[in-house]
Structure formats: structure tokens, C-alpha cells
Amino acid sequence: GARRLRVALLAERADASLGQHIERQLGAHWNARQVVLRSGSPLRLEGLERVDFARAGAILIPAADTMESSALDADTRTVKALMTMSAALEAAPPEEPPLVVAELQETRHGGILRALYPGPMEIVAGDEVISRLLAQIVRHPGLSHVYDEFLSDVSGSQIYVREGAQLA
């Protein structure tokens, strides 16, 4: 049968307040049995092993908060996390490396990530996404209101993605 989705979240400090924050953000979509919180650093193998990263279906690496660090620091942290994963996968290669979706602040660092990781990868470039959104807003007056509604942190203003087969 199909496996149920489980989310393992690795955070520097995973505690009850983090769980409560996630629960508030997800609202009715929250299911405590599907979310596992683990403390650790994605820059250290011990932390990655706590979430069994080598057997994951997908790994999401969000960029560090640029309010607390520079874009270069955020991208450096992403590169280091990927280097740690790559070294571990090289030492004990799984049948198929997990898909990695990594966020970068600067598009020019994408080549480094692709060279480091042996498996499938998608790169989300924060600067590029913002540039494209701004270009669309300039071309289509009024679109800023639509994006504001989609991207604001207000209940009911989220974008949910479904498999194509579910829409048929």
C-alpha cells in the first residue's frame, strides 16, 4: 500500500514551542502523528542521521533568515549542509539518493550545489523569484494585489499544491 506522508523536521532547537508554532501555522492541517521534530544541525552528520535523511523521499533546505545574516552566509550554510549530505551518501550510497529542494539567495551559487550533490535536485532562487514577480507586477498592473493575497501570512491565503491525478 501507499506510505503515509511523514515529515521529519531538523531544527537547531526543536522544542514544544516550535511544535506549537507549526501547529498554529497549519491549523486544521496539523497532525502530530505525521510530524517528527528533532534537534540538531544540518551541518553535522549526527543531526542528519536523526531524521534518517538518506531514506527520505525529499529533503527541503530553506535558506537561512537573511534578516539575521547576509545572503552569502545563507547560501554558504546551504552549501555546507549539502556537502555534509553528499559525503555521507558517498560513504554509504543508498539505492537512490533523495530529491533535494534547496533555496538559494543568489542564483549564481546554483552551479556549486549541482556539482556537489549526486542525486536529483531542484533549486529555488529567492532573488530570481522576487525579480520575476516584480517584472510581472510591472507588466500587469493590479497583479500586486493578487500576489499580496497569496503570499501574505494570513489564514486562508496559502497556496496548496495537489498531484495532477487528483484533479482529473
Listing of model-derived features with the role each one plays in the protein:
Residues 1-168:
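Cytosolic regulatory regions of ion transport systems
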